[in-house]
C-alpha cells in the first residue's frame, strides 16, 4: 500500500515546507504531487497533512509515516549501494610456498589491472594452517605443493619446479662432479624456513629416507637465506627459479639432489569453486604470468579448466 515513492515524497514535503517546493526537488509538477497524496490518503483512510498550512503541518498519522521514512530510506539507500558492490569481490589468498611471493606480487598487479573491483586479502601461513582454513571457508585459494587426500578440495596445477641444493661457489660440495647424495650433507648446516620439518622437501624426500640428520638452522627470509649461503654460513635447498638471478651473478651455485627432486605447485580451492568466474580468471592470470616469466619450471596447463575464462 505504501511505496518507497510515498516515503520520499513525504520527506521532500517535510524538508521543503510546501507542495510546490517538494515538487521542484522531486522533478514533478505540483498537481502530480497533490494527486499522489490524495490517492494515498484515500487508500489509507486518513489525512497525512493539513492543507494550506504554511509551513506544512503534518497530522499525527503523517508524523508516524514521516518517522518511518527517516528510518527506511537510509536503509534502502545503503542496500542499493551494497547491491552495486556485488562485483567487488574479495579473494582471500594464502601461500605455503615462502619464495612464491617473488613472482606472485607482479602477477597480482597484472590481475588487478584487469579486475580492479576484485580485492586480494593476503594471509600468511606462519599464523595458521591454510588448507584446513580453506576447507572451513576462511580462505578462497591456497598456493601449495601439498595435496591432502579426501579433503574435498580441488587442486589446479600451476607449474612443476625442481628443488636444488644451494651453496657458496667456494663450498667443497660445489666442486663435486656427481649429483649430491644424502650422506654428503651429514655434517652440514642446513638453513631452512621456520616450518615443521615434514613440510621441507629436502627432508621428506631426500634426507629422512636415508636416515641423515644435518644441523638445522632457521632463517625466515629468502633473501637473507641466500646471502647467508653466499657467505658460507651454511647451505640450503630452494626451487631453482628462486636463485636464478643470484646464480647468474656468481653469488651461489646449485646442485641436483640425487636424481632430482621435482615438485608441483597447485592452487587449492574448494571443490565446486572451479566454476566461479573470478576464481578461474585469477588462477589463469597467475599461471599465465609465471609460465611466461619464470625459468627452470615445467608448464602444467590444463586447458579444459579455462573454458569460458575471460580473455585477460
UniProtKB/Swiss-Prot annotation:
One of its GO terms (biological process) is methionine biosynthetic process. Its main location: cytoplasm. PANTHER family: HTH-TYPE TRANSCRIPTIONAL REGULATOR (PTHR30126), HTH-TYPE TRANSCRIPTIONAL REGULATOR METR (PTHR30126:SF25). CDD domains: PBP2_MetR (cd08441). Residues 19-38 bind DNA. It holds the Pfam family LysR_substrate. Control of the last step in methionine biosynthesis; MetR is a positive activator of the metA, metE and metH genes. Keywords: Activator, Amino-acid biosynthesis, Cytoplasm, DNA-binding, Methionine biosynthesis, Repressor, Transcription, Transcription regulation. GO terms for molecular function: DNA-binding transcription factor activity; transcription cis-regulatory region binding. Residues 1-59 form the HTH lysR-type domain. It is found in: Cytoplasm. One of its GO terms (cellular component) is cytoplasm. This is HTH-type transcriptional regulator MetR. NCBIfam families: PRK15421.1.
